[in-house]
């Protein structure tokens, strides 16, 4: 056999270039490894290889909003064109404003809130009401209007006209024509900033007055106008092509997976067996962790992903990267907003020995349907099984001063238990006498309270009548 058909042994393994992997799997080999062992489950699919129905229902469209229709109208049109159940957008644009409007479809609408709060970028044309003495004044005025600014919504707005603080992160003057009193500038700002108000403030600062002539949004959150921007006509044409020729390539081109909005988040990779538990709202624990990113701090927003690159949920980190590397147990992250549908992956909880025994005892009637003890429950189970459902997390007392109240509480409980045992040992006649005494005592207390109220009311009436007499004498 010739040498060209033989695979020769090598000491170096071929490197896979993960920088070209799609979406949330990019630079996967640079993630820190917690565990290399897990059982792959064939459920789920890579975001770009989902079947068309689930691809559309977990997709986002970076739409170039036309001038004149409102954002809600545009979103309603897309809902009608794609024949989907739900649509939402990443932040309202005024009717005359054009540019990036991220339209989320069905399952992706769960990310709308996070995109509405993300930063925005605009290109704006401002018309000044008079010529400037020095053309450089406009650039200097824009520089002054960066940072935290007070803004009141314009006269015609959909919200209450309250004074609010909004931040302008950066701004650049692109062009200025002093003869025509028109300036074009770019601004990066916080969500909820009114560019119309900014233009009015700019005119006031320059001493000539001004207003906004035209506006275009060039970035909204994670997507800019360079990231696969499509028009309403593109959406309509793609749906028409699919309906008439069954060619889904155009629909796949205009719709992007929802994972594109989460590329900026720190990632935590979850084992396939833990995915469905997280979808049902469980906290992610250390045993369910596969890989995690550098630089995660406590209470950071992170995205939980599967080994196929699907987003499971947006979560709040309960451990930093350092803790994740060293801890052998504990909560990694709490779910803030679940994205994935339940039961896409199979259930993999309740398979331990105690859980299986509990299941069997429920079936035999030795426990009730909630897993609580009943009259048929064996004594050994009652003594050995510890329910953690209502147990509060116990921490070691920091000092002796904290120990004392705990001891007192234990003593108090012991006394209560003794009293209860005494109560049980009493005869029915003794119990009846005690009940009657208690009722008499309660009646007496009520009577005393009523008398006190009456006395107070009479005293108040006497005071008011005296005051009236004094006034009449004057």
UniProtKB/Swiss-Prot annotation:
The gene is CBF5. Residues 431-460 are annotated as: 9 X 3 AA tandem repeats of K-K-[DE]. Component of the small nucleolar ribonucleoprotein particles containing H/ACA-type snoRNAs (H/ACA snoRNPs). Belongs to the pseudouridine synthase TruB family. InterPro entries: Dyskerin-like, PsdUridine_synth_cat_dom_sf, PsdUridine_synth_N, PUA, PUA-like_sf, PUA_sf, tRNA_PsdUridine_synth_B_fam, TruB_C. This is H/ACA ribonucleoprotein complex subunit CBF5. Catalytic subunit of H/ACA small nucleolar ribonucleoprotein (H/ACA snoRNP) complex, which catalyzes pseudouridylation of rRNA. This involves the isomerization of uridine such that the ribose is subsequently attached to C5, instead of the normal N1. Pseudouridine ('psi') residues may serve to stabilize the conformation of rRNAs and play a central role in ribosomal RNA processing. The H/ACA snoRNP complex also mediates pseudouridylation of other types of RNAs. Catalyzes pseudouridylation at position 93 in U2 snRNA. It comes from Kluyveromyces lactis (strain ATCC 8585 / CBS 2359 / DSM 70799 / NBRC 1267 / NRRL Y-1140 / WM37). CDD domains: PseudoU_synth_hDyskerin, PUA_Cbf5.
């Amino acid at each position: 056999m010739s040498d060209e058909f033989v695979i020769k042994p090598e000491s170096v393994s071929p490197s896979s270039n993960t920088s070209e992997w799609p979406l949330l799997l990019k630079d996967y080999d640079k993630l820190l490894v917690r565990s290399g062992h897990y059982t792959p489950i064939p459920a789920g699919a890579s975001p770009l290889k989902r079947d068309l129905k689930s691809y559309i229902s977990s997709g986002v469209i970076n739409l170039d909003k036309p001038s004149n229709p409102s954002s809600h109208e545009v979103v309603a049109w897309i809902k009608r064109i794609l024949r989907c159940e739900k649509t939402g957008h990443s932040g309202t644009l005024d009717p005359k404003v054009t540019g990036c409007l991220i339209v989320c479809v069905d399952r992706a609408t769960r990310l709308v809130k996070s995109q509405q709060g993300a930063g925005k970028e605009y290109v704006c044309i401002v018309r000044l009401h008079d010529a400037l003495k020095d053309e450089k004044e406009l650039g200097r005025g824009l520089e002054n209007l960066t940072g935290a600014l007070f803004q009141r919504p314009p006269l015609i707005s959909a919200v209450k006209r309250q004074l609010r603080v909004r931040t302008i992160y950066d701004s650049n003057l692109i062009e200025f024509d002093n003869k025509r009193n028109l300036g074009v500038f770019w601004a990066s700002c916080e969500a909820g900033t009114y560019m119309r108000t900014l233009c009015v403030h700019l005119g006031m600062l320059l001493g000539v007055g001004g207003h906004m002539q035209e506006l275009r949004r060039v970035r909204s959150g994670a997507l800019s106008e360079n990231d696969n921007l499509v028009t309403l006509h593109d959406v309509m044409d793609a749906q028409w092509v699919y309906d008439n020729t069954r060619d889904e390539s155009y629909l796949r081109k205009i719709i992007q997976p929802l994972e594109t909005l989460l590329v900026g988040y720190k990632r935590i990779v979850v084992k396939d067996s833990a995915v469905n538990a997280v979808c049902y709202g469980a906290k992610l624990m250390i045993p369910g962790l596969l890989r995690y990113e550098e630089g995660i701090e406590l209470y950071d927003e992170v995205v939980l992903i599967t080994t196929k690159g699907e987003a499971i949920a947006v979560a709040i980190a309960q451990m930093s990267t350092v803790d994740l590397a060293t801890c052998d147990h504990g909560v990694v992250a709490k779910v803030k907003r679940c994205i994935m549908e339940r039961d896409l992956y199979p259930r993999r909880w309740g398979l331990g020995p105690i859980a299986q025994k509990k299941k069997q005892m429920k079936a035999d009637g030795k426990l009730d349907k909630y897993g609580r003890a009943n009259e048929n429950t064996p004594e050994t189970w009652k003594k050995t099984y510890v329910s953690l459902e209502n147990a509060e997390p116990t921490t070691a007392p920091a000092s002796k001063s904290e120990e004392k109240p705990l001891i007192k509480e234990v003593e108090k409980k012991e006394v209560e238990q003794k009293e209860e045992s005494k109560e049980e040992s009493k005869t029915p006649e003794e119990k009846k006498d005690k009940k009657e005494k208690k009722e008499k005592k309660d009646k007496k207390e009520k009577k005393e309270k009523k008398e006190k109220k009456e006395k107070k009311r009479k005293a108040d009436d006497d005071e008011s009548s005296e005051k009236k007499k004094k006034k009449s004498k004057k």
